[in-house]
UniProtKB/Swiss-Prot annotation:
GO terms for cellular component: chloroplast membrane. This is Uncharacterized membrane protein ycf78. The gene is ycf78. Keywords: Chloroplast, Membrane, Plastid, Transmembrane, Transmembrane helix. It is a multi-pass membrane protein. The lineage of its organism: Eukaryota, Sar, Rhizaria, Cercozoa, Chlorarachniophyceae.
Length: 885
């Protein structure tokens, strides 16, 4: 947060209730009501009327105005003191970053220009919309604009100091009118002027340099300060001296400098703003065009008046301080000569000119030489068309760019010691901004751990073996060859042996990459998915057993993290930084614990839905895997976990995380820890947080994850296919009115149309994929009557009912129950199979009565009502025979 925002937020603590207080102290209402209440008491004679009009009403009106304008300020200070003693000040101050997200959102929505003010954006001395006091905001902003930090203002101060107040005021007016005209064009949208003027860069910049150099030349060639000081006692009479031409040149010079200069000392001070905007040129909100013109015009006028006032005050204060410094510290009471005073004045003027020259020279570094030469030709900075002409610091090899990035340099240097490392990214803005991502930023504890890896790799690094013959050339004439030998061995015997070996080798001229025998394989860093069966994994067991992790690697890492995390200062700073990052999100994104739990359930339901639609058809042993797992192999690979890819890794780097078996402890990881709570006995559902020790469990005894369900599921009768279909694709029926829902003709299931007796496997049909994860189970036309409705009112496939949740233990469930699904079953094998691996339909042998049919209709109607509610909860419904009884 910048100093401007910090100052603005601090003032908002005291004045946040000004608008509300203005609503209770309206000037017109107070004046009328007060007068109407007092007049009946005092009137009754002419003398009393005269006394009331002359002596009573003016003080009352003045008192009302005093209360209207100044009471909110005193009331704000009172609330500020109360908040200070109630320890709420720090809490209010910490919530300020949440406010700026609303402004960013309105900017993206493009509705910030003519939108009413925010209730929590009241600034210092700023009135409501109906009395927008932008004049005072501009007047206060001129406090920082008038500081003599730019070259133009330094020249104005020099004229004020050397030539007197008259020339100083003329120079200040030239600078101020030029500045206000620039603000006027920017705030009122004079695009032809602004775009055409700034498109001349860098010509306008060179124009500013020329004006400043011309001023320095005239100043040096002019008379000395002593000669000017002779006439300093006499007041300057502009008409008598007839220096109109000089006045016009001074005014025009400072006017042009206001449009051309771009550099100043302490440029951050000029961006300070007492208003609610981020800077002094931000457009404020207004309800109409006329109100916008009025507020912005008063704002510019306030800047104009304030700059004249504060510029004069600053110049007078600086000059008086210089004289007081000369009087106290330079000359004594007994030794005050005119020559010493003249020398002091000359020294101040000389130092001011040196400061002007220094600021001007320092501004040249803001423009690249290539940009200054090519921008007038239409080229942009770092244009690719000029990459072959100008010196380009961008690396063409992406691997080199990645290896040279901060945090990645050790891997590149370790693999190639012959590479000359040159860090050019700190001089190239384009490359420097794209080198680091958010996940790669290392905090102190992570830096210590990564630096330990660097030191460990440095100790284990071996010298890179080299060949005797490093380069070879082959000419067009194959009978003649040229060699350039770099001999690393001093003996002639070894040289002759290597030369003979090259002549005898037929493939000696083939360029080959010499492999480093000491290269370490980092296979152990790859964590295998523990849900794979061993028979399905194509790896070499001998090689896999030989590459195990180091035993002390995980323990040392935990010790380093614990060492830094128990440090109170580091812990507070880390928590403050993480909390501040989280607090900068939108206010509607901050959820409570019940909302987070509900969001987690929705995400699980959505992930199960997508997982049910996703087929791993390209995997080996797909049928066996689908039959055993019926879902993703691991929580790492499923859709739900992929949207949080990297979250657990980043958190585990910053904080010491461990699995705690205490059920009373609150969750330490959002989204992930509830999965561990659900499968507490089986920790390997989160195998990524288990230390790299392969002996902790056996692959043979690990049966993988439990199969998850895809909910909600629906069942209906497909009229086109004449089949019973179970699907997870929801088709909702929209009801416009409540009466339409009440008149929904839920058809009672007729007992005569119910098929008696169990179904046989011969009535089943081969499983077909109608839609994704929609299965056709029965082709018996008699089942259609169970889902029959009036086709004149509703279209086909509208009668979709919610399938019951997975409940294998309740065998008295009346309508449906769900089991695992086997993809593409063979009909011949199903007849001889004893495994229940189907969506099954249960039939009751008993005859149903009318009371049960009415209860069933009530439950079905309740389902449809819940579905048509416009929310996304995971509805589950159980239709139990016991509950009906």
């Amino acid at each position: 947060m910048s100093y401007t925002q910090l100052l603005k937020d601090f003032t908002e603590i005291s004045y946040w209730n000004i608008d509300n207080l203005f609503n209770y102290f309206d000037l017109d209402i107070i004046t009328k009501n007060t007068v109407n209440e007092i007049l009946p008491l005092l009137t009754g004679s002419f003398f009393l009327d005269f006394i009331v009009n002359k002596f009573i009403l003016p003080p009352i009106t003045f008192l009302n105005q005093l209360i209207y304008f100044y009471y909110p300020i005193f009331e704000s200070f009172k609330i500020f003191i109360l908040k200070l003693f109630q320890n709420d000040l720090l809490k209010i101050f910490s919530n300020f970053p949440l406010f700026y997200t609303n402004i960013k959102e309105n900017i993206l929505n493009e509705d910030i220009f003519f939108k009413s003010q925010y209730s929590n954006s009241i600034t210092l001395l700023q009135l409501p919309v109906y009395l927008d006091n932008k004049f005072f905001i501009g007047f206060l902003n001129s406090i920082f604009l008038s500081l003599p930090f730019s070259c133009n203002q330094l020249i104005c101060f020099y004229r004020f100091f050397t030539s007197g107040p008259s020339y100083g005021i003329i120079a200040t007016l030239g600078w101020l009118i030029g500045q206000c005209s620039l603000f006027f064009c920017l705030l009122f949208g004079f695009r032809p002027v602004i775009i055409q003027w700034f498109s001349l860069e860098p010509l306008n910049y060179f124009l500013a340099i020329f004006i400043i150099v011309n001023f320095l030349r005239k100043t040096i060639n002019s008379t000395t300060f002593t000669q000017k000081n002779k006439n300093r006692k006499n007041k300057v009479d502009l008409e008598k001296l007839n220096k109109q031409k000089e006045i016009e040149s001074i005014f025009g010079m400072h006017f042009l400098l206001s449009w051309t200069e771009s550099v100043s000392l302490f440029s951050n001070f000029s961006s300070f703003n007492f208003g609610r905007e981020s800077n002094i040129l931000s457009i404020s909100s207004s309800p109409s065009i006329s109100q916008y013109y009025l507020t912005q015009g008063s704002y510019i006028f306030g800047i104009f008046i304030g700059c004249i006032f504060f510029s004069y005050i600053y110049n007078v204060i600086i000059i008086r301080l210089l004289f007081r410094f000369h009087k106290v510290f330079i000359t004594s009471n007994n030794n005050k000569t005119n020559s010493e005073f003249k020398n002091f004045m000359n020294l101040v003027g000389f130092n001011t000119l040196v400061l002007i020259i220094g600021v001007t020279i320092a501004s040249i570094s803001n423009f690249d030489v290539g940009y200054l030469l090519t921008s007038s030709l239409g080229f942009t900075p770092q244009d690719k068309a000029l990459s072959r002409i100008l010196l380009n610091t961008n690396s063409s090899d992406p691997q080199i760019r990645i290896s040279l990035a901060p945090g990645r340099r050790d891997g590149f240097i370790g693999n190639d010691n012959d590479f000359m490392y040159i860090d050019i990214f700190s001089f190239n803005d384009k490359e420097y901004k794209n080198t680091l991502e958010f996940e790669e930023v290392n905090y102190q504890v992570e830096y210590e751990w990564m630096s330990r890896y660097d030191k460990f790799n440095e100790r284990e690094r071996r010298p890179k073996p080299q060949k005797s013959i490093d380069t070879k050339k082959e000419f067009n004439n194959h009978s003649m060859k040229e060699y350039r030998s770099l001999d690393v061995f001093p003996t002639d015997r070894y040289k002759n042996r290597e030369t003979k070996k090259i002549f005898n080798d037929n493939n000696s001229f083939i360029n080959e990459n010499y492999l480093n025998k000491n290269t370490k394989f980092n296979f152990y860093k790859e964590i295998m998915d523990s849900n794979f069966k061993l028979d399905f994994i194509p790896y070499k067991k001998a090689f896999f057993a030989a590459n195990t992790t180091e035993a002390d690697l995980f323990e040392v890492q935990q010790e380093i993290k614990q060492k830094y995390y128990i440090n109170t200062i580091y812990k507070v700073l880390l928590n403050f930084e993480v909390d501040s990052m989280i607090s900068r999100q939108l206010t509607n994104s901050i959820l409570l614990e019940p909302q987070e739990a509900d969001l987690f359930n929705r995400r699980v339901a959505l992930s199960n839905y997508y997982e049910s639609n996703y087929y791993y058809s390209k995997m080996n042993h797909f049928d066996l895997f689908r039959n055993n797992f019926f879902n993703s192999k691991s929580y790492i690979n499923n859709v739900y976990n992929q949207q949080f890819n990297g979250t657990l890794r980043i958190v585990s780097k910053l904080f010491p995380i461990s699995l705690n078996e205490n059920p009373n402890q609150r969750s330490i990881l959002k989204f992930d820890y509830p999965l561990i709570e659900e499968y507490r006995k089986n920790k390997y559902t989160h195998e990524e947080i288990i230390p790299d020790k392969f002996n902790q469990f056996s692959y043979d005894n690990y049966k993988g994850l439990l199969s998850t369900t895809s909910s909600p599921l629906y069942i209906t009768w497909n009229h086109n296919l004449n089949q019973l279909v179970i699907t997870n694709n929801l088709i909702l029926k929209n009801f416009n009115t409540k009466s339409q829902l009440d008149s929904y003709p839920f058809y009672s299931i007729d007992e005569n149309k119910l098929i008696q007796g169990p179904m046989t496997l011969t009535n089943l049909q081969t499983l077909n994929n109608l839609v994704r994860n929609s299965y056709s189970l029965f082709s018996n036309p008699a089942l259609r009557k169970l889902f029959y409705v009036n086709e004149n009112i509703f279209y086909q496939n509208d009668n979709i009912f919610l399938l019951d949740a997975l409940d294998l233990e309740n065998y008295e469930q009346y309508l449906f129950f769900k089991l695992n699904v086997s993809p593409k079953p063979i009909e011949a094998s199903l007849k001889n199979s004893n495994s229940v691996n189907w969506y099954a339909f249960r039939y009751n042998d008993e005859i149903r009565d009318q009371k049960r049919d009415e209860e069933a209709n009530k439950y079905i109607k309740y389902i449809v009502q819940e579905i048509n509610k416009d929310d996304e909860r995971n509805y589950k419904f159980k239709y139990d025979l016991k509950s009906m009884n």
